[in-house]
């Protein structure tokens, strides 16, 4: 009994000590509306079952092509790509768009809701033209992603989870985007911008404001994800076909 109490006391002390350094892992979904507060939908004037939404004729053709990728009778497997298509058409996913996806794929609406509320890539509230997603998990944090986040907030005059008054930029924090070797990095719409400094992200924002699309990828001079100090192997052009093969072969 005493041992358990001691453990609980120690755990409480560690929590208090480190709590100010630990980010709330659930808040990403809360901030970008991917799940909304407690993943609950509440009708609003701009987001309710009567909000106008229908796929364009071109997108109906795309849906037909998507569904053909899956076995007959398994349209439900296409929920993710068709939700993505709806979001790309509309900019975000109102409940009416989810209902349309369910109708087109002939699945219960709940099967669509559970997907749309699970993945943070689906936006359940409007976002700006440029959706800035800053990775702040461990590798990026160790590479000073906080300075990138602060630079964006200062440059745009908004906080995490907010959109600029001109509807041009929305800023959120996200969990790992899978480009840890190029930390710190951000995703803006579909593009990755890596090996960033505060100055880099300010320049990227300036280009976007000017109507340009900055070149994606590392900003440090690296081609891809090779070692920052230069190649340590495969430093010469590859040999041609047959190199090193025994003469008898």
Curated annotation (Swiss-Prot):
Binds 1 [2Fe-2S] cluster. It catalyses: a ubiquinone + NADH + 5 H(+)(in) = a ubiquinol + NAD(+) + 4 H(+)(out). It is a peripheral membrane protein. It is an enzyme of class 7 (translocase). Transmembrane segments: none annotated. Its cofactor is [2Fe-2S] cluster. The modification N6-acetyllysine is found at residue 61. Its EC number is 7.1.1.2. GO terms for cellular component: mitochondrial inner membrane; respiratory chain complex I. [2Fe-2S] cluster binds at residues 135, 140, 176, 180. It is found in: Mitochondrion inner membrane. Keywords: 2Fe-2S, Acetylation, Electron transport, Iron, Iron-sulfur, Membrane, Metal-binding, Mitochondrion, Mitochondrion inner membrane, NAD, Oxidoreductase, Phosphoprotein, Respiratory chain, Transit peptide, Translocase, Transport, Ubiquinone. Residues 1-32 form a transit peptide. The modification Phosphotyrosine is found at residue 193. Residues 213-249 are annotated as: Disordered. The keyword Nucleotide-binding does not apply. One of its GO terms (molecular function) is 2 iron, 2 sulfur cluster binding. GO terms for biological process: mitochondrial electron transport, NADH to ubiquinone. The keyword Acetylation applies. Core subunit of respiratory chain NADH dehydrogenase (Complex I) which is composed of 45 different subunits. This is a component of the flavoprotein-sulfur (FP) fragment of the enzyme. Core subunit of the mitochondrial membrane respiratory chain NADH dehydrogenase (Complex I) which catalyzes electron transfer from NADH through the respiratory chain, using ubiquinone as an electron acceptor. Parts of the peripheral arm of the enzyme, where the electrons from NADH are accepted by flavin mononucleotide (FMN) and then passed along a chain of iron-sulfur clusters by electron tunnelling to the final acceptor ubiquinone. Contains one iron-sulfur cluster. Belongs to the complex I 24 kDa subunit family. NCBIfam families: nuoE_fam, PRK07539.1-2, PRK07539.1-5. This is NADH dehydrogenase [ubiquinone] flavoprotein 2, mitochondrial. It comes from Gorilla gorilla gorilla (Western lowland gorilla). The lineage of its organism: Eukaryota, Metazoa, Chordata, Craniata, Vertebrata.
């Amino acid at each position: 009994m005493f041992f358990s109490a001691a453990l609980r006391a120690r755990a409480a002390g560690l929590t208090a000590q480190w709590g100010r350094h630990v980010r709330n892992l659930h808040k990403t979904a809360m901030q970008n509306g991917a799940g909304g507060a407690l993943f609950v939908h509440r009708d609003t004037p701009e987001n309710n079952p009567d909000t106008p939404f229908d796929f364009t004729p071109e997108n109906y053709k795309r849906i037909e092509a998507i569904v053909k990728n899956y076995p007959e009778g398994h349209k439900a497997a296409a929920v993710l790509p068709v939700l993505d298509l709806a979001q790309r058409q509309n900019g975000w996913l109102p409940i009416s768009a989810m209902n349309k996806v369910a109708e087109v794929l002939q699945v219960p609406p709940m099967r669509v809701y559970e997907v749309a509320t699970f993945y943070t890539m689906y936006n359940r509230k409007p976002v700006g033209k440029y959706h800035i997603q800053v990775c702040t998990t461990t590798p990026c944090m160790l590479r000073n992603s906080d300075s990138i986040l602060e630079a964006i907030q200062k440059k745009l005059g908004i906080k995490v989870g907010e959109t600029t008054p001109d509807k041009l930029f929305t800023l959120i924090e996200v969990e790992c985007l899978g480009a840890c070797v190029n930390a710190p990095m951000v995703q803006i719409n579909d593009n990755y911008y890596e090996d960033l400094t505060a100055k880099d992200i300010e320049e990227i924002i300036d280009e976007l404001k000017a109507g340009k699309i900055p070149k994606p990828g590392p900003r440090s001079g690296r081609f891809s994800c090779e070692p920052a100090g230069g190649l340590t192997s495969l430093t010469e052009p590859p040999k041609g076909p047959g190199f090193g093969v025994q003469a008898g072969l």
